[in-house]
Amino acid sequence: MSTLIMGLAIPFIGTAAGSACVFFLRKELSVSLQRALTGFAAGVMVAASIWSLIVPAIEQSQVLGRWAFLPAFLGFWLGILFLLLLDHIIPHLHRNIGQTEGPKSRLTRTAMLVLAVTLHNIPEGMAVGVVYAGLRSGSGEITAGGALALALGIAIQNFPEGAIISMPLCAEGKSTVNSFWLGVLSGAVEPIFGALTILAAALIVPAMPVLLSFAAGAMLYVVVEELIPEMSAGEHSNIGVLLFAVGFSLMMALDVALG
């Protein structure tokens, strides 16, 4: 149980630590640094989706022979459609263009910005939850080291995400303390959805490959819909692509070394 709690808490701690940067760094993050951090986060999420979620989903379905890809295929598309639905029913703000999405709302710009990050933290919590659910179920394709690698990888990419939300809020006039707590709040959904996913998975263990790829599809939706546009916004620069490669390589190394 302690391993499970630690696994769910690690990504949230990453967000909180990143949000705490607002106490030490007084200036808003430069555009180049934001691009770099966003690219890094995208790389980690893509690698985690492949090595920690899609590959185990296919490996768990080998009994289906040539159709072993089907559960992963189905779950992937369900994850994409789930995030697409949330994108359309929850009002939120895209940081890179300042444009709102979802139904019309009287929410403040700050509230919609926090909602945007919160929305995109949901699949990360689900990813950690479903991997730890697989570990609890005794799945041979998921090891304690692999689950820890995913939790650490998401925590690493959550650190810059926490800073990217708290520091601009402070620069816009929010108090340092409020900016910190808003950043922390955006990450609170991760352990919540992680725990909910574990409970759901415990009820439908045979559907584990679908759940794994569902989380992967949801995470990749966030990467393509939000992170890639952010790391490519403004004047042309390769910094986002280079840090994407760094994030991908780091997550791949973590998964292999700890898995």
Give the residues covered by each predicted segment.
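Intrinsically disordered, metal-sensing/regulatory segments
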Residues: M1-G259
